[in-house]
Design a protein with these regions (language model features):
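Class I SAM-dependent transferase core
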Residues: 1-70, 74, 104-121
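A general structural signal for well-ordered alpha-helical segments in protein cores
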Residues: 5, 27, 57-60, 84, ...
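Conserved glycine-centered beta->alpha loop in an early N-terminal alpha/beta scaffold
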Residues: 77
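Conserved SAM-binding loop of SAM-dependent methyltransferases across substrates and taxa
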Residues: 80-93
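S-adenosylmethionine
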Residues: 94-97, 101-228
Length: 228
């Protein structure tokens, strides 16, 4: 195990994640596939392995403590697989579905699922199935919080939670979107400020849940189907 993965294993423990040898091996495989495919399609703009391991792998693991054991997770706008693939590598108890409409990135995710050979990891494309199926909706690069909730909430069970991974202006965005979220019947559940090591990379996790006393039918009506 090289020093970078030793750092990943140590820092992951800060977020309640214990990485065994199998998980570290899968992260190593994932790293190499990311770099290979990035030569063909634009998956990321990181400069080196250290940035990928800290700003992508470790960053993705910061939400793990909020995900209940055995939960079903939908990662919308997964792109290169973040945060869904690192979460699944580290938490084999979870069922993780990656949603990606950009065709090149979709096929990369399909490839990674075949390479990793991890059970209960799927990739989907936007369509019209699977309403009210998931316990958690997670996203790192989808866009405004209110848009994420509007787009993703139909996929969640009644008590489902949305977790949006934001940068340093996350709370400002939450405040701006509050009137829209309130109208849709959603309220903030938690706000967690995190600083990742080495790069002093700041992350704000924002959790939202339905306010059942104010819930409306505002939101999209399409669902998701498997293309496996």
């Amino acid at each position: 195990m090289n020093n970078l993965f030793k750092i990943l294993r140590k820092e992951a423990e800060r977020f309640g994640v214990v990485l065994d040898d199998e998980a570290v091996g899968n992260f190593s495989l994932y790293l190499e596939e990311l770099k290979t495919w990035n030569k063909k399609i634009n998956l990321f703009r990181r400069k080196n392995d250290q940035e990928i391991i800290i700003k992508d792998f470790l960053d993705s693991l910061t939400i793990s403590k909020y995900l209940s054991p055995g939960a079903s997770i939908l990662d919308i706008g997964s792109g290169g697989g973040f945060p869904g693939i690192p979460i699944k590598i580290s938490r084999r108890d979870l069922r993780v579905v990656l949603s990606e409409i950009r065709i090149k990135k979709f096929f990369f995710l399909k490839h990674m699922i075949r390479v990793l050979e991890i059970k209960n990891l799927e990739v989907m494309a936007a369509s019209n199935e699977r309403l009210e199926e998931f316990d958690f909706l997670i996203s790192r690069a989808f866009g405004p919080i209110a848009k994420l909730v509007e787009t993703g909430s139909p996929y969640l069970k009644g008590n489902g939670i949305v977790i949006s991974m934001k940068g340093k202006k996350g709370e400002e965005e939450l405040h701006q979107d509050h009137p829209i979220l309130n109208k849709m019947g959603w309220t903030s559940y938690f706000v967690d400020h995190i600083e990742l090591p080495i790069f002093e990379h700041k992350r704000i996790l924002i959790g939202l849940k339905r306010d059942v006393s104010r819930e409306t039918n505002f939101g999209m009506t399409s669902k998701i189907i498997s293309i496996s």
